[in-house]
């Protein structure tokens, strides 16, 4: 089970797709969409990222920052971001320490095979650093619209 709403979002530091260290606390004062996804350039993850990209102007207008996190490398994030022209930072959690911190790393099943990986989850964090909403078992195609609606932003 991921961390619940109503608690402070744990701070962390990860490298972004420009190889720059980013701390969550650097973004205090802004609403943040912190979304965890399994892997760069895979069908569901691409759909989710591209929907955030397509709605990016609405997020920007509302002052909402999007941060994507996966266990991929910085190099992988660079390729993914360039290929799909993603306008928001992607953070490399190669050792899945932040996934563990937010409790979104766990057992998964695909084509009958069980393995450990990222459980697609999004945290909405307010300007005070509090988790205000958690989306579990995210459906990539509809997710950006759900997030905007949760922030009260028209789509």
Question: Model-found features: residue ranges?
Answer:
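Chalcogenol-based redox active-site neighborhoods
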Residues: 1-155
């Amino acid at each position: 089970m991921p961390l619940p709403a109503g608690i402070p979002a744990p701070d962390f530091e990860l490298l972004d797709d420009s190889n720059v260290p980013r701390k969550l606390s650097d973004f205090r004062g802004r609403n943040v969409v912190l979304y965890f996804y399994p892997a760069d350039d895979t069908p569901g993850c691409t759909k989710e990222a591209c929907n955030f990209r397509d709605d990016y102007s609405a997020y920007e207008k509302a002052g909402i920052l999007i941060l994507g996190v996966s266990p991929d490398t910085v190099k992988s994030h660079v390729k993914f971001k360039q290929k799909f022209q993603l306008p928001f930072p992607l953070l490399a959690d190669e050792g899945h320490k932040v996934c563990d911190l937010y409790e979104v790393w766990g057992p998964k099943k695909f084509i009958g095979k069980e393995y450990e990986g990222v459980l697609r989850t999004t945290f909405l964090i307010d300007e005070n650093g509090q988790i205000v909403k958690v989306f579990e078992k995210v459906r990539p195609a509809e997710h950006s619209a759900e997030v905007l609606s949760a922030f009260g932003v028209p789509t």
